[in-house]
């Protein structure tokens, strides 16, 4: 009985930590105006890892054009173990853009998605003609798709 209580406490603490990290995710200049959705289009089982192809839609609610140069699927908690993938996406003011990207991640992490965990996407962006910065956004699953 004690081991069950310990496991439950550890799981609860882990979820609290994930929630806290999600709330305090690093935000750049474009962090408040960029949001994203994803759809899994293909998966390949690689043993302890999974190769996932995502169709990603980014939305820009701001007044400036945003140039996305690289995308990285962030781990839980934001481990940053994923490699940077080139992404040549232009987000016009109040516009959106879709692109497809392939990522390799731990199978355990991928399985968390089906339990409600949201993947986070690290983006290298340039807003207007300004300096390059990095933002991290949570991706929402596109309704009814998977």
Language-model segment annotations:
Residues 11-20:
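Bacterial N-terminal signal peptides
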Residues 26-48:
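Low-complexity, acidic Ser/Thr/Pro/Gly-rich terminal tails and inter-domain linkers that flank the onset
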Residues 48-55, 116-119:
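Short, solvent-exposed loop/turn segments enriched in Ser/Thr/Gly
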Residues 58-62:
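Asparagine-centered strand-capping/turn motif at beta-strand->loop junctions
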Residues 63-79:
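Short acidic, flexible loop segments centered on an aromatic residue
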Residues 83-120:
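Short, solvent-exposed, Trp/other aromatic-anchored flexible loops in extracytoplasmic proteins
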Residues 107-146:
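Terminal connector regions
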């Amino acid at each position: 009985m004690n081991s069950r209580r310990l496991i439950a406490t550890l799981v609860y603490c882990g979820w609290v930590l994930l929630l806290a990290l999600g709330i305090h995710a690093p935000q750049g200049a474009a962090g408040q105006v960029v949001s994203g959705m994803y759809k899994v289009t293909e998966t390949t089982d690689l043993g302890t890892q999974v190769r996932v192809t995502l169709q990603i839609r980014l939305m820009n609610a701001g007044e400036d054009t945003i140039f996305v140069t690289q995308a990285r699927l962030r781990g839980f908690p934001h481990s940053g173990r994923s490699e940077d993938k080139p992404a040549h996406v232009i987000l016009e003011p109040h516009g959106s853009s879709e692109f497809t990207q392939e990522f390799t991640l731990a199978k355990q992490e991928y399985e968390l998605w089906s339990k409600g965990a949201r993947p986070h996407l690290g983006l290298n962006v340039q807003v207007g003609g300004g300096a390059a910065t990095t933002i991290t956004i949570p991706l929402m699953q596109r309704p009814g798709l998977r």
